[in-house]
Amino acid sequence: MDLGLRGRKAIVCAASKGLGRACAEALAAEGVDLVLNARTATPLQQAAAEIAAAHGVRAVAVAGDIGDAAVREALIAACPAPDILVNNAGGPSPGRLKSFTADDWTRALDGNLRAPAAMLAAVLEGMAARGFGRVVNITSSVVRHPIDVQGLSAAARAGLHGLVSTLVREHVGRNVTINNILPGPFATDRLISNFTFQAKQKGISPEEALAARKAELPAKRFGDPSEVGRLCAYLCSAHAGYISGQSILIDGGAHPQIL
């Protein structure tokens, strides 16, 4: 299926690896030119070069912490009229409520609520004026199915979902959609970090913790980041203009539900 995206322009955050990189790859495969962001310059520049070479698109790297207003301004300067925004950020470190410091809360909210909110504020008006816009927020399944050591992530990301719910109706009539993807367990560095923390608590090795979790999953495997990438690309497509305000769980059936 041609997604009708060739020649469009996208900003993709946290794009040097993992789910962000997968979203960038999937969009580039559809002919979308990219402006990519991540904290560390070298891997980001390498990702941009590899994506551009593989797909024949323009891919520009803007390194820095998306929580920094100057970095957000640089992203918009590099892509002043984006058609697509993929908000994505590394999640906060796992822990228990009593262990969270004021700095922990600030970092969690800056990266997973304030920064994506600021990016939304920067792009939505222009998208609406041009008559096309697609925003995809990569959040987490913990918004719907909390994990006891993911309190910071659940709190910050749930806040973003709440904000999105107030914006959808205002913009969908001008062909601007905003959706959330809620990944479950995917084979990323983030997964390994989380299970290393849990393994330490349980007195087992990270490998044992990962194997036990995989055995519990209905799919008997962790998700591949490309599966999130392809879902993201479809939500950004010309065919998805009637899908907005949705929070789509992609977790291999790990969390049973009726609605």
Please place each PLM-identified region on the residue numbering.
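Short C-terminal tail/terminal secondary-structure segment
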Residues: 145, 233, 244-259
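Substrate-binding pocket helix/loop in short-chain dehydrogenase/reductase
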Residues: 96-97, 104-109, 213
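Short, small/polar-rich loop/turn modules that mediate ligand/substrate recognition or access, typified
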Residues: 172, 177, 243-245
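Conserved glycine-rich cofactor-binding loop
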Residues: 14-17
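Alpha-helical segment proximal to the catalytic Tyr-Lys
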Residues: 125, 169-170, 241
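Catalytic loop of short-chain dehydrogenase/reductase
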Residues: 136-159, 164-173, 185-186
